[in-house]
Every structure is written in structure tokens, then in C-alpha cells.
Amino acid sequence: MKKLIILGSTGSIGRQTLDVVRSLKEEFEIVGLTGYNNVSLLSKQIKEFRPKVVAVKDEEKARKLRENLDEPIEVLTGKEGLKEIVKYEADMVVVAVEGIAGLIPTVEAIKLGKNIALANKEVLVTAGEIVMGLVKEKKIEFLPVDSEHSAILQCLKGNNKREVSNLILTASGGPFRGKKKKDLVNVTVEEALKHPNWKMGKKITIDSATLMNKGFEVIEARWLFDMPLDKIKVVIHPQSIIHSMVEYVDGSVIAQLSVPDMRIAIQYALNYPDRKYVEGVKFLDFYALGQLTFEEPDFETFKCLSLAYHAAECGGTMTAVLNAADEVAVSLFLQNKINFLEIAEIIEEALENHKNIQNPTLDDIISVDLETRERIMRKYLR
């Protein structure tokens, strides 16, 4: 039985990971779970999966959690709790916690030699060089949970990486595919949250609407697969059936296809290199599929994608600024404090005003993250 710790078990990916575990209960044992605010859902998860230890946001949430439980359990709190929980004996840590909060526990888990299933974008976007350096040093398995990166991993398997011509990440184009800037000035939060194919959390859904999500995935792919940026392409594929492709030097393209269901990518990371069927996952019906279509991304309208490429080319702490500025800008948009197009404007301004630090330490990255957030919030929440 493989022992798992799931960071962020009450979020979208965390819940789907537990779906996979529920379907494959003979394969996995849950050692630890963490939830931020959702004490009631975490209580239910504890009763079902019976972990040894859990972690929550603060002491107040810990008290509420203990009140909800019949049996005593070790409850850790705060940022220290996230660092502490990965020290428990486990074969794999699933990093499904949102935001920069996922960085330190991931680094701690790698240092302890634990395999990682990564569903957090910020870890590689902000600190890819440091993290992948540790992965190589510790010789652990570091497996992507993102459907696009999982697809690339599968398309590379059994092939010579030196023969890769391009990694091709697919993007649905989000709810505003085909629109121009003038059409996007007055879009509402509700419209931006209507993703055509995937059910996800609010932050990642807005990032999909701006194409920043794809920009983050380009940066992640660079570090995960040790590939130069000019060999990582993005193509709009509205049906979200092809999850990504690898083009080889002979002109062959290998693609991974499936229905849009995150549990397929999750099970692959948890069972790697094996595959297991997860109850409820549908198979593709090629007769009913109809057309698969492809378009070039509109870098002018969806400027976040080009900002991500720019930050990645600059390196250093620029990607930490990109990430922090995006997180604050999306939060402001969700609160109706700014319009949709201002998300990219805020990020661009933050990048222009930043004095880049090359070869940053983790402390540099965390302090740049904090400074960027504070600067933007001071300006927009006066």
C-alpha cells in the first residue's frame, strides 16, 4: 500500500485525489490531510480516510475541528503545520494546496526524499530552478498532476528527449476565445468564471480566461522537462480532448487524448508508471467526437500569455513577481475592484517596476512575493 499525504485535500484537486483513492482503496493509505478553512469538509474526510495527522489554518480552526471529531487526532496549524506534516512517514506527498504556501512544504518533502505529485503551479513558476535542482539531487519522482504536463510526460515516455522538436501545450481558449480587447472591457466575474470544459476553483478559472494559466504551464514545462522556452508552444484546442502533444525531429507528433477529467492525470501520478481505472471516468467515444480544431493564440488580446513568456525569459525573481501580481490582480477582479483587462495591466506594471534578482534564494523569492502583493494592494485598496 502506498502511503499518501495530501496538502490541500479540501480544494478541487484534493477532493478529486480522494475520489481516486476511494476508487482504489486497496492501493493507498492516507497518512495526512490539510485543509485551510473548510473544517466541515475536512472533518468528513478525516472520518472516512482516518489519517494519523491533519493541518489547518490556525488554532481557532483546530479547535472547531476537534469539536467535530469523535476520536482524538493530531492537529497541526499554520505555515509550520504544513512544514511539519510532510515529515510523517509517507511514500508520496500530493501538493494540491493553492498559492505560494505550497512552496516551502514541497521543498521540505523533497529534502526528506519523498516523491511528489504536484498540482500547485506556484512551486515551479516561482522557484523552478531551485526545486528541480533538489529533485535531481535527491533522485525522487516528481510527477505532474496538471493534465497538460501529465500528457507531455506520457508522450515522452519511451522516446529519446534529444529527438524532441517541440512540446505543444493545448489550451481551451477559455470563455472569451475569439473575442478582441474591445469586447472584454465590461465582462463580468460571472462570465469569466464560465469555463467551457473544466470544473475548477475560481482563481485557476480566471487564469484560464486570461490565458495566464497557460503561461504558467509554459514555465512549469520548462523546468519539469528541462526544455528551452523556444521549444514550448501553445495551441488553442477548444474541445480539450487532446491534452498536449510532443513533436519530434522527424515530423511525428505524439498526442495524449482523453475526456476532460482530472482524475485521469491524478491516478497516473499516484500509480506511476502503472495505470489504474478510476470508477466514473468515461472513455472517449470517437464516433460521437466529431471535429477536433486548433487555432493560434491571440497574444495581443490575451497579453498575460506573452507576459509569462517574457518573465520566463528574464528568469530570476521575475516569475515570482508574475505569479504574485497575477494572484492579487485576479483577487481584485473577483471583488469587482478592477475590470478584466486591468489584470494584465497590473501584472505588466509590476514586472516593469521590479529590479530582477538572478539566482535567487528561497528567502529572496518569498520576500519578492510579499513586496509585490503589498505594493499592488496599497495602490488598489486605498
Curated annotation (Swiss-Prot):
<feature type="binding site">
    <location>
        <position position="12"/>
    </location>
    <ligand>
        <name>NADPH</name>
    </ligand>
</feature>
<keyword id="KW-0414">Isoprene biosynthesis</keyword>
<keyword id="KW-0560">Oxidoreductase</keyword>
<protein>
    <recommendedName>
        <fullName>1-deoxy-D-xylulose 5-phosphate reductoisomerase</fullName>
        <ecNumber>1.1.1.267</ecNumber>
    </recommendedName>
</protein>
<feature type="binding site">
    <location>
        <position position="213"/>
    </location>
    <ligand>
        <name>1-deoxy-D-xylulose 5-phosphate</name>
    </ligand>
</feature>
<feature type="binding site">
    <location>
        <position position="214"/>
    </location>
    <ligand>
        <name>1-deoxy-D-xylulose 5-phosphate</name>
    </ligand>
</feature>
<comment type="similarity">
    <text>Belongs to the DXR family.</text>
</comment>
<dbReference type="GO" id="GO:0030145">
    <property type="term" value="F:manganese ion binding"/>
</dbReference>
<dbReference type="GO" id="GO:0070402">
    <property type="term" value="F:NADPH binding"/>
</dbReference>
<dbReference type="GO" id="GO:0030604">
    <property type="term" value="F:1-deoxy-D-xylulose-5-phosphate reductoisomerase activity"/>
</dbReference>
<feature type="binding site">
    <location>
        <position position="195"/>
    </location>
    <ligand>
        <name>1-deoxy-D-xylulose 5-phosphate</name>
    </ligand>
</feature>
<feature type="binding site">
    <location>
        <position position="172"/>
    </location>
    <ligand>
        <name>1-deoxy-D-xylulose 5-phosphate</name>
    </ligand>
</feature>
<dbReference type="InterPro" id="IPR026877">
    <property type="entry name" value="DXPR_C"/>
</dbReference>
<feature type="binding site">
    <location>
        <position position="147"/>
    </location>
    <ligand>
        <name>1-deoxy-D-xylulose 5-phosphate</name>
    </ligand>
</feature>
<feature type="binding site">
    <location>
        <position position="120"/>
    </location>
    <ligand>
        <name>NADPH</name>
    </ligand>
</feature>
<feature type="binding site">
    <location>
        <position position="146"/>
    </location>
    <ligand>
        <name>Mn(2+)</name>
    </ligand>
</feature>
<feature type="binding site">
    <location>
        <position position="122"/>
    </location>
    <ligand>
        <name>NADPH</name>
    </ligand>
</feature>
<dbReference type="Pfam" id="PF02670">
    <property type="entry name" value="DXP_reductoisom"/>
</dbReference>
<feature type="binding site">
    <location>
        <position position="121"/>
    </location>
    <ligand>
        <name>1-deoxy-D-xylulose 5-phosphate</name>
    </ligand>
</feature>
<feature type="binding site">
    <location>
        <position position="38"/>
    </location>
    <ligand>
        <name>NADPH</name>
    </ligand>
</feature>
<feature type="binding site">
    <location>
        <position position="148"/>
    </location>
    <ligand>
        <name>Mn(2+)</name>
    </ligand>
</feature>
<comment type="pathway">
    <text>Isoprenoid biosynthesis; isopentenyl diphosphate biosynthesis via DXP pathway; isopentenyl diphosphate from 1-deoxy-D-xylulose 5-phosphate: step 1/6.</text>
</comment>
<dbReference type="InterPro" id="IPR013512">
    <property type="entry name" value="DXP_reductoisomerase_N"/>
</dbReference>
<dbReference type="Pfam" id="PF13288">
    <property type="entry name" value="DXPR_C"/>
</dbReference>
<keyword id="KW-0521">NADP</keyword>
<dbReference type="InterPro" id="IPR036291">
    <property type="entry name" value="NAD(P)-bd_dom_sf"/>
</dbReference>
<feature type="binding site">
    <location>
        <position position="148"/>
    </location>
    <ligand>
        <name>1-deoxy-D-xylulose 5-phosphate</name>
    </ligand>
</feature>
<dbReference type="GO" id="GO:0051484">
    <property type="term" value="P:isopentenyl diphosphate biosynthetic process, methylerythritol 4-phosphate pathway involved in terpenoid biosynthetic process"/>
</dbReference>
<feature type="binding site">
    <location>
        <position position="11"/>
    </location>
    <ligand>
        <name>NADPH</name>
    </ligand>
</feature>
<comment type="function">
    <text>Catalyzes the NADPH-dependent rearrangement and reduction of 1-deoxy-D-xylulose-5-phosphate (DXP) to 2-C-methyl-D-erythritol 4-phosphate (MEP).</text>
</comment>
<dbReference type="InterPro" id="IPR036169">
    <property type="entry name" value="DXPR_C_sf"/>
</dbReference>
<feature type="binding site">
    <location>
        <position position="208"/>
    </location>
    <ligand>
        <name>1-deoxy-D-xylulose 5-phosphate</name>
    </ligand>
</feature>
<feature type="binding site">
    <location>
        <position position="10"/>
    </location>
    <ligand>
        <name>NADPH</name>
    </ligand>
</feature>
<feature type="binding site">
    <location>
        <position position="217"/>
    </location>
    <ligand>
        <name>1-deoxy-D-xylulose 5-phosphate</name>
    </ligand>
</feature>
<feature type="binding site">
    <location>
        <position position="201"/>
    </location>
    <ligand>
        <name>NADPH</name>
    </ligand>
</feature>
<feature type="binding site">
    <location>
        <position position="13"/>
    </location>
    <ligand>
        <name>NADPH</name>
    </ligand>
</feature>
<feature type="binding site">
    <location>
        <position position="217"/>
    </location>
    <ligand>
        <name>Mn(2+)</name>
    </ligand>
</feature>
<dbReference type="Pfam" id="PF08436">
    <property type="entry name" value="DXP_redisom_C"/>
</dbReference>
<keyword id="KW-0464">Manganese</keyword>
<keyword id="KW-0479">Metal-binding</keyword>
<dbReference type="InterPro" id="IPR013644">
    <property type="entry name" value="DXP_reductoisomerase_C"/>
</dbReference>
<dbReference type="InterPro" id="IPR003821">
    <property type="entry name" value="DXP_reductoisomerase"/>
</dbReference>
